[in-house]
Amino acid sequence: IADLGGLRLALRALKATDGFNSTGLIDGFTPVQRFFLSWAQCWRQNITQERSLQLLTIDPHGPNELRCNGPLSNMPEFHEEFGVQETDPMYKPEPMRVNIW
């Protein structure tokens, strides 16, 4: 819940900046696409399966992959910016998307 809410607020803050509309494509990505790519970079990890299983028992947070992909798949902006289709792994039908705050 907090990850999704925080991501929504951060995207809203990005869109409210003075330079948001003046920043065009960089390396072929829009500002919003770069925002989502930065989010994904935050959650990257190189971890063994053993350590991953250990974290499931001691860490109150979900696995990084779920913390990254869960909020993204619930955001219409993500679907729009990347043209996510029904056949894509990150696709979530609109009625199934969580909308908090």
Residue ranges and their predicted role:
Residues 1-101:
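Zinc-dependent metallohydrolase catalytic domains
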